[in-house]
Regions:
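Hydrophobic, aromatic-enriched interface-forming segments
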Residues: 120-122
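Conserved G/P- and acidic residue-centered "switch" motifs that form tight phosphate/ATP-binding loops
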Residues: 117
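Active-site-proximal beta-strand elements of phosphoester/diester hydrolases
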Residues: 214-218
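N-terminal beta1-alpha1 cap of cysteine-dependent amidohydrolase-like domains
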Residues: 1-114, 124-127, 132, 136-167, ...
């Protein structure tokens, strides 16, 4: 008997894009996420940010075996009670609200969650944490992001007794990243499970009380040799969906 193919929800960016004769806002996601999930044996399903008064994010989870929260623009600092820094990018309030609600509903169901870059930051904020809005102010360097449109290569040190180490298959990992923000206050119930070699920037967070809840600041989908997405999809394969009506 063949293994069940898990449905993996993939959150989308909101960007103004040009295609053909049209320029308009669109929901989009880099194909690297889609292909990484498919290579690992999952069925990627794209989830566009939708206002909560139109779609209850928790009802979407009836269709899913796991959620991957993708990278993208900065989160509105108001979501963690701070004013915007001069270097904070223009925010997408609808996406912020949608993903925070989606994560909280997924956590309630103990559905596997993987947060990538911004997605890790969404997990942290959903747990009541806060973000450092511009790391170069403190670090006095910007090695966590490459030139425009290019990922930076660096290394992270992973705690040996962590989900991050189990998923990555190593405690010292070469990664690709592109970010200027990071975790300043870790969310309630989360643990730091990886840090950047050299400057100690928080690179991974997880909730050991959950089946699989992991956020990484790097981009595992950009490296075909990376094992994280595969570990996540395997956990999704074993997940059991719990329809909303049955929980009522």
């Amino acid at each position: 008997m063949s293994e069940r193919t898990p449905n993996v929800g993939v959150t989308c960016n909101v960007e103004v894009v040009k295609y053909g004769l049209w320029t308009e806002p669109a929901a989009m996601v880099p194909l690297t996420y889609v292909r990484a999930i498919a290579r690992a044996g999952g069925r990627p399903l794209l989830i566009a940010p939708t206002p909560a008064d139109l779609v209850d994010p928790s009802e979407l989870l009836d269709l899913l075996d796991g959620v991957l929260i993708t990278g993208g623009a900065d989160i509105d600092p108001a979501a963690y009670g701070e004013q915007s820094h001069a270097e904070t990018e223009p925010v997408t309030a609808d996406r912020d609200a949608f993903e925070l609600a989606l994560v909280r509903a997924a956590v309630e169901r103990d559905l596997p969650c993987l947060g990538v870059c911004r997605g890790m930051q969404v997990l942290n904020v959903a747990y009541g944490g806060a973000l450092e809005q511009h790391l170069p102010d403190r670090l006095e360097h910007d090695i966590h992001r490459g030139d425009a449109g290019e990922f930076a290569d660096h290394r992270v040190e992973v705690e040996p007794d962590s989900l991050a180490a189990l998923a990555a298959g190593a405690t010292h990992v070469a990664v690709k990243s592109y970010h200027h923000q990071g975790v300043s206050r870790v969310g309630d119930g989360l643990r730091v499970s990886a840090r950047a070699e050299g400057d100690g920037t928080v690179e991974a967070i997880e909730d050991a009380r959950r089946r699989f809840l992991l956020g990484v600041l790097w981009h595992p989908e950009e490296d075909e040799a990376d094992r994280l997405v595969g570990a996540f999809v395997r956990e999704c394969r074993g997940a059991t969906r719990e329809p909303t009506a049955q929980r009522a």
